Amino acid sequence: MHKASSSKKSFDDTIELKKNEQLLKLINSSEFTLHNCVELLCKHSENIGIHYYLCQKLATFPHSELQFYIPQLVQVLVTMETESMALEDLLLRLRAENPHFALLTFWQLQALLTDLSTDPASYGFQVARRVLNNLQTNLFNTSSGSDKNVKIHENVAPALVLSSMIMSAIAFPQLSEVTKPLVESQGRRQKAFVFKLARSAMKDFTKNMTLKNTLLNKKTSRSKRVSSNRSSTPTSPIDLIDPIKTKEDASFRKSRHSEVKLDFDIVDDIGNQVFEERISSSIKLPKRKPKYLDNSYVHRTYDGKNINRDGSISNTAKALDGNKGDYISPKGRNDENNEIGNNEDETGGETEEDADALNSDHFTSSMPDLHNIQPRTSSASSASLEGTPKLNRTNSQPLSRQAFKNSKKANSSLSQEIDLSQLSTTSKIKMLKANYFRCETQFAIALETISQRLARVPTEARLSALRAELFLLNRDLPAEVDIPTLLPPNKKGKLHKLVTITANEAQVLNSAEKVPYLLLIEYLRDEFDFDPTSETNERLLKKISGNQGGLIFDLNYMNRKENNENRNESTLTSNNTRSSVYDSNSFNNGASRNEGLSSTSRSDSASTAHVRTEVNKEEDLGDMSMVKVRNRTDDEAYRNALVIQSAANVPILPDDSQDRSPELNFGSNLDEVLIENGINSKNIHSQTDALADQMRVSAVMLAQLDKSPQQLSESTKQIRAQIISSMKEVQDKFGYHDLEALHGMAGERKLENDLMTGGIDTSYLGEDWATKKERIRKTSEYGHFENWDLCSVIAKTGDDLRQEAFAYQMIQAMANIWVKEKVDVWVKRMKILITSANTGLVETITNAMSVHSIKKALTKKMIEDAELDDKGGIASLNDHFLRAFGNPNGFKYRRAQDNFASSLAAYSVICYLLQVKDRHNGNIMIDNEGHVSHIDFGFMLSNSPGSVGFEAAPFKLTYEYIELLGGVEGEAFKKFVELTKSSFKALRKYADQIVSMCEIMQKDNMQPCFDAGEQTSVQLRQRFQLDLSEKEVDDFVENFLIGKSLGSIYTRIYDQFQLITQGIYS
């Protein structure tokens, strides 16, 4: 019996060995792809050795290919439970090699944490939090700590392997070189402490930790007496006799007075407890302005120190008092806590800061809210206060101008002793990279903030408010910012640099609650790098070391003279002072802006003058009621009342009056002001900058008027109309020209891609992309640079773009297969940059417009030219092709027809395999070469509009398309059929790759397209019809896919439904 068992075991080992040999041979073969590697990571997650080897293989692929699979790598990291640390180490290693990889991974993890936060105890949340913590520490921290000196924890398996390696190295020295990285990687894995009491003692453990902190802070020796006298508390499992022991000793020593049974089932719980005590509080996220103002953040200021509610001195104040000679990174209030946390890890001992941290962390979440992280300057300004103790609401209001100046002085004094000549090259490079990551994340946050502000502005004033906000944002450009993924590939070691946003070309895309907007961004290709020896970077390092760039893209500060002084020489200096929109002298006859509130004010009442005084004192007008407020402070409520009171005093004009009250007439005399001050670029920029500030204030007034009391309802409408009229007048002063007036844009419904570039070069659709680009270059102050370029992107907030990004990834994978198999089809490779769970940037399609807009514009023109009946007639795509490409027998038309056929075949197969729904003409684009492309993949795979399978056809193939292709007997249609067959058969060869991409992403994924769970990939595989022969596949495509789609009644009904409900032309 024993021999049979031993023989069976030997046989199994032999089979396992052969499998491993075959796997090794596959991995090392030339045909092994990156996708194969990601797929094997999922299958062999339980084997640490194989998992480690696969991760080492991953590192050999180019960074461009690795960036493509970042969503899958992150998904594997958080969903595949494994003891291996190899993938986590690989991601941290790649972030040091490629800044784009670091940013994309950071944003992807940040978005995933939003989903995982519903279950903080899950494996995925713990891993994502740990990796995000490490990423933030390395990306935003400028300290010279070494990543190599990482503590190896008490892990038995790596320790045994290490011991064996040392012994075997005597006979085989090369073994240590191979095994050492694996041992170090696994040794860093956080392990739980096994010497812990039973599960029922967890609550007592927390109470005892709090008691221990209190006793240590008071430095008393009453620990035994207090512990024994607390009859309401069970016997303490913590021995506090020797206070110099470490936290781990004090927390996990067995009590000498009672015998406690050990329960090893709670190992993971204790590991989580230790993790939260020592690590979670040090998570550092980029500074983000608070969404809500909460009274829970009120603390006392006394002698320059922030006093928490429990009476302990905050760590921020201690850092300011005790580390004045050290450099402190200007990233946020949590930085000081992180430094304390790092010191604790290095020394292993306890300090008063440790006690405070433990006491406070018990009441805080493990993952801080991005919107509640305060700028470090808030603490600095508090620390600079002197005099008697007083309460200071340090987090309820943004900084005033004086507080901002004081904070910059404090920050400057903290870092002025840094000598750049004493820093190593590595430290300088790290400072440059940290500055780049800070600028990137702050820029993304600023775009999100603008969208949130626009959502609170009336629809009519959104475009004016958008241009004002973008003009203010431009004050911090040029900056070390590029747009990963969306901009063209960089040269090795170089990055693109954003220089300005063309504010007068920006567009609000629709009037929905979520306000996406179009940006045209000017940038210089391959403009900057991280070489600390270059002249430009030397100046930048001086700026960073002097802490001059602490605030960037911060829309809360309206007076930015200090920041403008530090801008690059190529940017224009902004105006020093700002006046309020309530100051009627600001733009009258070019009067001096320094007069402010003079004795000759045109106010009709003392209350109005009082409002002006308050407004001039409060510089941060941009935030006034632009966000929803929880637990409003008294000051905010008071200011709101003053605004309403001021609005009530604005005289109501008769209907036949053309004049505005002086308070609202801030834009009429702009030309006079510019002429009086002298027509030069600096003055024009300065005056327009001031105008942007005042437009923001007008937007604030509109938001306030919408909340006005009932007794003011009659006057509010008139005042509101006056403000909007003034804003539109200023909007014209920015150089904006309405596309409706210029190009006869089709209809009121501006779909997102209709304003991307201006559209195809025809008389009824507008200028093409090349013309627009050249026009902007001629008027740009950076257009003379040889590496100048222009890009258009859509900024979205409030929508989860990860599903659409996954769709574009799948389409690009299919396009790569078609290129490899030499199938002559065309696909637009769209890109999306995810910056959080509900924000992102979307690439636009240049020289393309939706079929809806083309039809509507052409219909209007044909009716005007009497070529179409105005009673129900609608222009067709063939009419558009005839006007755009000429004679049907000409080369230009035939080429456009061929382009239409090749692109239609590709998207037909894509729509069938991915089950793309909502295929109305607003989501189908035609470019200036005749190519068709689909956008908006909000409904695909498992979900459909209204959860109803309304679109039953495999893809959209209308009679209009057939007419454009020359009919069912036309050569173009026959080519379409053949290309559809070829493209479908080519994808069938790589069905496993496409299905596995779906399988990896569907696990524990909350995106709507994965509502069917595991059945999502099963159904996708079924659509490939892998059981059919080649001949049967041809029949399936021609008779089922094309035959069922051609002129489908379901397609016609859905188009008619969209026409009736949304006004989208069918």
From Swiss-Prot:
Q: Where is the PIK helical domain?
A: 1-133
Instruction: Name its species.
Output: Saccharomyces cerevisiae (strain ATCC 204508 / S288c)
Q: What CDD domains does this protein's entry cite?
A: PI4Kc_III_beta (cd05168)
Ranges annotated as biased composition (Polar residues): 374-411, 570-597
Q: Could you describe the subunit structure of this protein?
A: Interacts with FRQ1.
Coding gene? PIK1
Q: What is this protein's record name?
A: Phosphatidylinositol 4-kinase PIK1
PANTHER family attached to this UniProt entry: PHOSPHATIDYLINOSITOL 4-KINASE BETA, PHOSPHATIDYLINOSITOL KINASE
Q: Which InterPro entries match?
A: ARM-type_fold, Kinase-like_dom_sf, Phosphatidylino_kinase_fungi, PI3/4_kinase_cat_dom, PI3/4_kinase_cat_sf, PI3/4_kinase_CS, PI3K_accessory_dom, PI3K_accessory_sf
SUPFAM superfamilies in the record, alphabetically? ARM repeat (SSF48371), Protein kinase-like (PK-like) (SSF56112)
Sequence ranges of Acidic residues compositional bias: 342-356
Region described as Catalytic loop: spans on this chain: 915-923
Q: Which reaction does it catalyse?
A: a 1,2-diacyl-sn-glycero-3-phospho-(1D-myo-inositol) + ATP = a 1,2-diacyl-sn-glycero-3-phospho-(1D-myo-inositol 4-phosphate) + ADP + H(+)
